[in-house]
């Protein structure tokens, strides 16, 4: 056997402490692998385990650091890209704003209008082509008809003349003349279809002017209303030009009407006749008609103003006992006459008016309702139904509603009694 000794293998001596340092140092010899034989090889492999773990840890740490650095470098690049995109958007908005600002120009408005027109046609709001043509033709015909009418000022003047003619209405001429005028108007209505042509309008206007000058007073009011309605219907029938034969017939009727009106008595003569009839009637009433003692005569009626006082119901009875009524007012003249009598004597006096049957609905004792034209005779703020006031009285310069159980003076009314000496 040889005396030389083989060096001992120290499997766990990979790391040795350097006495000059406080840390652990690696020596080159530690990385030299020594060949072992037999059971010593497994022990050497176990000695290299911690080194492998350390290497893996260093590799993982390095990978994490690299990833962080990459992200850090990417952030400025992303921010720069976003900034550039914002710049592009801002530029687009600026251009859009400038384009909108130019919309007010006439050319842009025209373009918009054309687009809207095309849109309307596309939506289907316009009628089909055949209907458009029909509508256009109707409008053309309407325009042509309107163009043939006389000018507005002349039509207005004609209407004013007819209004003045109506205002000139007075009383009834003799019956034969009335019948003749009525027949002429009837023929005129039947003959008229539509207005004559514009050239004839002036002639008709002149005829109406002469007719107005010749008219003194038209027939009585009831007949006048009928004639006015006929003239209104005649106006409604106005349209376009009638045929020549009908036009001739219209002129003939106007001529007859003018002749009939020309024979009427003038207005001054009619007024004189009316005045004479009024005077004659008054004289007859004074000579042949009498009111009872203590009664006052006015316009064909007799009035009794009491000197004592009663409530409203007893006043009604008192008038009935003498063949009269608690006064029922029929005209403004009668109201003025009675108001003057009561105001002179400074007496509150009952009249035959109440709303006993229905609150707010005033009615005379003869059953007739209070005319709306008489509402102006109430004193200011009356009737107010203060304290169940249902009966009307003369009070001062007007009417007042008062409680029916209050005692007042009263006024009776009855027609005058006329007689003949035998």
Curated annotation (Swiss-Prot):
Q: What is its main location?
A: membrane
PROSITE patterns documented for this protein: C_TYPE_LECTIN_1, C_TYPE_LECTIN_2
Q: Where is the C-type lectin domain?
A: 297-413
- Which GO biological process annotations does it have? adaptive immune response; endocytosis; innate immune response
Residues modified by carbohydrate are 92, 384
sequence repeat ranges per the UniProt record: 108-130, 131-151, 154-176, 177-199, 200-222, 223-245, 246-268, 269-291
Coiled-coil regions listed: none
Q: GO CC annotations?
A: membrane
> Looking at the record's lineage, which domain of life comes first?
Eukaryota
Motif Endocytosis signal in this chain: where?
14-15
- Region spans: 8 X approximate tandem repeats: 108-292
A GO term, aspect molecular function: metal ion binding
**Which segments does the topology annotation call Extracellular?**
71-422
**Compartment(s) of residence:** Membrane
Q: Which Pfam families match?
A: Lectin_C
Cytoplasmic face: residue ranges?
A: 1-49
As for membrane topology, the entry says: Single-pass type II membrane protein
Membrane spanning stretches: 50-70
Disulfide bond residue pairs = 288-418, 291-302, 319-412, 391-404
Keywords for this protein: Adaptive immunity, Calcium, Disulfide bond, Endocytosis, Glycoprotein, Immunity, Innate immunity, Lectin, Mannose-binding, Membrane, Metal-binding, Receptor, Repeat, Signal-anchor, Transmembrane, Transmembrane helix
Residues annotated as binding Ca(2+) are: 382, 384, 386, 389, 400-401
- Oligomer and partners: Homotetramer.
**Protein's job:** Probable pathogen-recognition receptor involved in peripheral immune surveillance in liver. May mediate the endocytosis of pathogens which are subsequently degraded in lysosomal compartments. Probably recognizes in a calcium-dependent manner high mannose N-linked oligosaccharides in a variety of pathogen antigens. Is a receptor for ICAM3, probably by binding to mannose-like carbohydrates.
Q: What is known of its domains?
A: The tandem repeat domain, also called neck domain, mediates oligomerization.
Q: What is this protein called?
A: C-type lectin domain family 4 member M
Give the organism, scientific name. Answer: Symphalangus syndactylus (Siamang)
Name the gene.
CLEC4M
